[in-house]
Amino acid sequence: MPELPEVEVVRRGLDAHVTGKAITAVRVHHPRAVRRHEAGPADLTARLLGMRITGTGRRGKYLWLTLDDGDEPLARRAESSVALVVHLGMSGQMLLGPIPKEDHLRIAALFDDGTALSFVDQRTFGGWLLADLVTVDGTDVPVPVAHVARDPLDPRFDRDAVVKVLRGKHSEIKRQLLDQTVVSGIGNIYADEALWRAKVNGARLAESLTKPKLAEILDHAADVMRDALGQGGTSFDSLYVNVNGESGYFDRSLDAYGREGEPCRRCGAIMRRDKFMNRSSFYCPRCQPRPRVRRA
């Protein structure tokens, strides 16, 4: 599933290539792709026609395009009040260029300059919906994103406030890193990478860690996601690509995730994998020892 760096790569591509364009046609090829838009495909299509993209936004793994009615010149328009929220799901792709002729095309939009944007989604977990913008903590976000906390790459991210929240949590630190209401954007891959860098096992209770160690984990999460962003994100297959259809290559630089049975790059111990929340956690048993189970 795309995490923060992968979504940010897509956002940057869209921001550079679709901002300022007006939508002249929309076709929904699969109803599941608009199931989150409660008014249905016809309403989504009708409302998007003639709207102009004024910008892009992201919080954590959530991506959106801000819109207006397209009637006023760009310089005289008020701030947007509605957004097209894009859920990439497990395999969603926002592709620029000619509309592809393939079975997994879900939505296609044409612009006033003759270019097109296609939403391709093999597993159909993603989709589009229109939502109003609301102001939360000084930032305009779509209503479905209002509950999501700021992510470590957000300029207004308050690391100390998040550390304070984590210190009060009687649950595993990895579980808290994946909680989008505590801190957003850190998915399974980058949680494992941050914990490996901090030499902390994900099964440790958040409340058992010191404030400096929690701050270190958050700093590592930010650093590893910046590193991934610089390499176009992490792609294990062809499902994650940027707006030009190109895969990222940070998977070659991963220190923990997916490295079960391989030597730890730091100490040489054999990396292990544990089941966790219907996912897998990868860690070094020497650098990141599991917490001891207290006997009653």
Curated annotation (Swiss-Prot):
PROSITE patterns: FPG_CAT, ZF_FPG_1, ZF_FPG_2. DNA binds at residues 104, 123, 169. Gene3D superfamilies: 1.10.8.50, MutM-like, N-terminal. CDD domains: EcFpg-like_N. A zinc finger (FPG-type) spans 255-289. Signal peptide: none annotated. Pfam families: Fapy_DNA_glyco (PF01149), H2TH (PF06831), zf-FPG_IleRS (PF06827). Its EC number is 3.2.2.23, 4.2.99.18. Keywords: DNA damage, DNA repair, DNA-binding, Glycosidase, Hydrolase, Lyase, Metal-binding, Multifunctional enzyme, Zinc, Zinc-finger. One of its GO terms (biological process) is base-excision repair. The active site is at residues 2-3, 61, 279. It comes from the Bacteria. Disulfide bonds: none annotated. Its cofactor is Zn(2+). GO terms for molecular function: 8-oxo-7,8-dihydroguanine DNA N-glycosylase activity; class I DNA-(apurinic or apyrimidinic site) endonuclease activity; damaged DNA binding; zinc ion binding. Monomer. Involved in base excision repair of DNA damaged by oxidation or by mutagenic agents. Acts as a DNA glycosylase that recognizes and removes damaged bases. Has a preference for oxidized purines, such as 7,8-dihydro-8-oxoguanine (8-oxoG). Has AP (apurinic/apyrimidinic) lyase activity and introduces nicks in the DNA strand. Cleaves the DNA backbone by beta-delta elimination to generate a single-strand break at the site of the removed base with both 3'- and 5'-phosphates. Belongs to the FPG family. This is Formamidopyrimidine-DNA glycosylase. It comes from Mycobacterium sp. (strain KMS). The gene is mutM.
